[in-house]
């Protein structure tokens, strides 16, 4: 069975592949491969979100790495993009994030970054997977003198906060702004509120008391209802919501409207173009990005390139084409001038700076950006359904979608989720009634085939 998915290793804790045994062997395999390539003892940094299972996985990875002669640097709860930054800042050889992002607390995962701050290549993931599954690995283990050590790094959050502040123009601040923040009881529960406070904003924080099981629970980027309520009640200028590992951000304007990644990407693109900093006047988005946004950017002289869903594909296209801005509707925004991955706190601060600089309310920044009606349905795949049958269901649904599209002024996207056992159906159409009818029809067909 395949261990690595589209975004590292992920699954329900204590169920394959998210078991202590697999994590131990993953740590051993990573360290072994690094030792073959490096002239020195491997140094590997480990960060995590706030899930209770993070302790289990952190201990297993640390044991695996140190048993193979590598040193481990433990930074505790910290956003995924902070690990990408710290890997470069601390000159270590690799970084590991223990997180299942927006998934419930019962899930967890492992993402690995190489020493340049980019996610591991598929080739290296395959090499690690082969060693995990190799019963004869490791044939030789280090002697007692060659074992690694584990160190706890106390100032990691402070380093990351100072880095984010450095992305703003010198002497700039956010004084005069009132900002509501929902870190989803996740990895940024201290960082984003502290960051905005140090920049001079008035900060109201909710869902910032993680207990190991409340991460993403009816809060954060996927459940913005409580943030909408607090923004309205406190008359905040806007609200910020992250997911569990804070690699994404969505905003809420002062009227309580959700400002997703499509809007954020558009505002950032226009601002960069105005400052002549948008490379090749191009942004990279995914197939999920709204057609209305694409048309709006086109009229503004900005080209959009689409990729498959997943920030790794956005990053790949950005590197290939030499672009510096990309993102997803879900709120993964990659500002390549500062970071190599989706970074929720950086996105939030950059947007706050634009709002203050232009002296506009967020609602005014988005009011002219058109959106075609769009709806998404997630169809759960039965646990024991073979992969071939899932592929067959998607194929038949896609054929049905092609027929339905002939009578639409829009599009249909059907794809398997890369992180959960679900089929995702997205329908976009200028006519909201037709959109609902098409979505209901496809859902009925999918449920019939999966029952």
Curated annotation (Swiss-Prot):
One of its GO terms (cellular component) is cytosol. Activated by phosphorylation. Transmembrane segments: none annotated. Binds 1 Mg(2+) ion per subunit. It catalyses: alpha-D-glucosamine 1-phosphate = D-glucosamine 6-phosphate. The modification Phosphoserine is found at residue 101. The active site is at residue 101. It comes from the Bacteria. Mg(2+) binds at residues 101, 243, 245, 247. PROSITE patterns: PGM_PMM. InterPro entries: A-D-PHexomutase_a/b/a-I, A-D-PHexomutase_a/b/a-I/II/III, A-D-PHexomutase_a/b/a-II, A-D-PHexomutase_a/b/a-III, A-D-PHexomutase_C, A-D-PHexomutase_C_sf, A-D-PHexomutase_CS, Alpha-D-phosphohexomutase_SF. Catalyzes the conversion of glucosamine-6-phosphate to glucosamine-1-phosphate. PANTHER family: PHOSPHOGLUCOMUTASE (ALPHA-D-GLUCOSE-1,6-BISPHOSPHATE-DEPENDENT), PHOSPHOHEXOSE MUTASE. This is Phosphoglucosamine mutase. The gene is glmM.
């Amino acid at each position: 069975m395949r261990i690595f998915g589209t975004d590292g290793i992920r699954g329900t804790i204590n169920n394959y592949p998210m078991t202590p045994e697999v994590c131990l062997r993953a740590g051993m395999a990573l360290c072994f491969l690094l030792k073959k390539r490096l002239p020195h003892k491997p140094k590997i940094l480990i960060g995590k979100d706030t899930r209770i299972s993070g302790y289990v996985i952190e201990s297993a990875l640390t044991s695996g790495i140190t048993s193979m002669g590598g040193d481990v640097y433990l930074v505790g709860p910290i956003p995924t993009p902070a690990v990408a930054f710290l890997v470069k800042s601390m000159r270590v050889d690799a970084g590991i994030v223990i997180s299942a992002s927006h998934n419930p607390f019962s899930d967890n995962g492992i993402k690995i970054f190489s020493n340049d701050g980019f996610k591991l290549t598929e080739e290296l993931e395959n090499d690690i997977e082969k060693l995990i599954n190799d019963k004869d690995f490791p044939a030789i283990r280090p002697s007692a003198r060659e074992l690694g050590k584990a160190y706890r790094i106390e100032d990691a959050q402070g380093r990351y906060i100072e880095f984010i502040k450095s992305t703003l123009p010198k002497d700039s601040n956010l004084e005069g702004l009132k900002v509501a923040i929902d870190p989803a009881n996740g990895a940024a529960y201290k960082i984003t509120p502290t960051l905005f406070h140090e920049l001079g904003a008035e900060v109201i924080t909710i869902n910032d008391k993680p207990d190991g099981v409340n991460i993403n629970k009816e809060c954060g980027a996927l459940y913005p209802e409580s943030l909408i309520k607090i923004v309205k009640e406190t008359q905040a200028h806007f609200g910020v919501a992250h997911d569990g590992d804070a690699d994404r951000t969505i905003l809420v304007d002062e009227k309580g409207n959700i400002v997703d990644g499509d809007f954020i990407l558009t505002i950032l693109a226009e601002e960069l173009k105005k400052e002549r900093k948008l490379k090749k006047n191009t942004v990279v988005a995914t197939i999920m990005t709204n057609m209305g946004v694409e048309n709006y950017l086109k009229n503004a002289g900005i080209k959009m390139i689409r990729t498959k869903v997943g920030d790794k594909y956005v990053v790949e296209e950005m590197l290939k084409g030499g672009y510096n801005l990309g993102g997803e509707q879900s709120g993964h925004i990659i500002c390549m001038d500062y970071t190599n991955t989706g970074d929720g706190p950086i996105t939030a601060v950059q947007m706050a700076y634009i709002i203050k600089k232009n002296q506009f309310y967020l609602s005014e920044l988005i009011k002219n950006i058109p959106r075609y009606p769009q709806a998404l349905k997630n169809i759960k795949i039965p646990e024991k359904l073979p992969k071939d049958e899932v592929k067959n269901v998607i194929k038949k649904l896609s054929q049905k979608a092609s027929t339905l599209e002939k009578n639409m002024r829009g599009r249909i996207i059907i794809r398997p989720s890369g992180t959960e056992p679900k089929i995702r159906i997205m329908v976009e159409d200028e006519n909201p009634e037709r959109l609902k009818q098409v979505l209901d029809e496809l859902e009925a067909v999918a449920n019939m085939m999966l029952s």
